[in-house]
């Protein structure tokens, strides 16, 4: 199980993980690592939250919010943001399904993808700033949001089909069992409620899960399934929705 954790950490982040820590693990086994997603989100969000706390007293809340969101993007190598941009480029092209999937494969950034990146990043910075001004514990909020975003992405894997013939997302989409889905969602809920006691964390988690479930159904209807890009979009939007729900 420890090998799966290190493999997942290296897979969805840019944190330096020695290859020997996940040595001998077959790529096809990665689907079992979905249960690690909330914990990986907890780590990434915790680092981002620490950066916010360290910078807040030095440069103020707005700049601290800017740098903690920038750090989060760098920690993931922009992996999920790229998926968000590609998904929006494809979906909002208003073309046929096959053409949408082709556009999503294009490495060039389109207008809709650019607008989506601007909106999501700016919204995160503004929401983090507002939460801090309201006295929300930001280390806990950011760690919980990242755990919620990654945990809720399992809703786009279970009982969904892969929209393409091949790709990274095929490792998870349609390969996750009901038991793994329940464990992943349960862990995300536990992380959120422990870090944000009372109804605040639980309520934000419920809102996030409902929103991502609806997103998954809309994407399924539009694309005929899910891709690695739509998983990235779900993670980014899940983080934002969780933070918004804390307001």
Swiss-Prot record:
UniProt membrane topology term: Multi-pass membrane protein
GO CC terms, sorted: plasma membrane
Keywords of the record: Cell inner membrane, Cell membrane, Cobalamin biosynthesis, Magnesium, Membrane, Transferase, Transmembrane, Transmembrane helix
EC number: 2.7.8.26
Membrane spanning residue stretches: 34-54, 59-79, 113-133, 138-158, 171-191, 194-214
Pfam families in UniProt: CobS
EC class name: transferase
Any one GO biological process: cobalamin biosynthetic process
Pathway: Cofactor biosynthesis; adenosylcobalamin biosynthesis; adenosylcobalamin from cob(II)yrinate a,c-diamide: step 7/7
Catalysed reactions listed for this entry: alpha-ribazole + adenosylcob(III)inamide-GDP = adenosylcob(III)alamin + GMP + H(+); alpha-ribazole 5'-phosphate + adenosylcob(III)inamide-GDP = adenosylcob(III)alamin 5'-phosphate + GMP + H(+)
One GO MF term: adenosylcobinamide-GDP ribazoletransferase activity
Cofactor(s), names only, from the UniProt record: Mg(2+)
Keyword Chaperone attributed: no
Cellular localization per UniProt: Cell inner membrane
NCBIfam families named in the record: cobS
Function: Joins adenosylcobinamide-GDP and alpha-ribazole to generate adenosylcobalamin (Ado-cobalamin). Also synthesizes adenosylcobalamin 5'-phosphate from adenosylcobinamide-GDP and alpha-ribazole 5'-phosphate.
Family: Belongs to the CobS family.
The protein's name: Adenosylcobinamide-GDP ribazoletransferase
The organism of origin for this protein: Salmonella schwarzengrund (strain CVM19633)
Gene: cobS
């Amino acid at each position: 199980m420890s090998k799966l954790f290190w493999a997942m950490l290296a897979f969805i982040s840019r944190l330096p993980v020695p290859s020997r820590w996940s040595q001998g693990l077959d790529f096809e086994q990665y689907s079992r690592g979905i249960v690690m997603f909330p914990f990986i989100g907890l780590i990434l969000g915790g680092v981002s939250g620490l950066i916010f706390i360290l910078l807040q007293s030095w440069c103020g809340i707005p700049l601290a919010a800017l740098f903690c969101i920038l750090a989060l993007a760098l920690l993931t190598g922009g992996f999920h943001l790229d998926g968000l941009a590609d998904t929006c480029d494809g979906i909002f092209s208003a073309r046929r399904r096959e053409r949408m999937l082709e556009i999503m494969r294009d490495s060039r950034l389109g207008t809709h993808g650019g607008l989506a990146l601007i909106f999501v990043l700016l919204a995160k910075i503004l929401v983090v700033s507002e939460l801090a001004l309201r006295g929300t514990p930001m280390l806990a909020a950011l760690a919980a949001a990242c755990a919620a975003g990654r945990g809720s992405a399992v809703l786009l894997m279970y009982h969904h089909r892969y929209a393409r013939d091949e790709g990274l997302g095929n490792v998870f989409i349609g390969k996750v069992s009901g038991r793994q889905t329940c464990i992943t969602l349960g862990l995300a809920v536990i992380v959120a409620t422990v870090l944000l006691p009372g109804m605040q964390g639980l309520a934000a988690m419920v809102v996030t899960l409902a929103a991502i479930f609806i997103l998954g159904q809309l994407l399924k209807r539009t694309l005929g399934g899910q891709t690695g890009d739509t998983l990235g979009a779900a993670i980014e939007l899940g983080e934002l929705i969780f933070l918004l729900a804390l307001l």
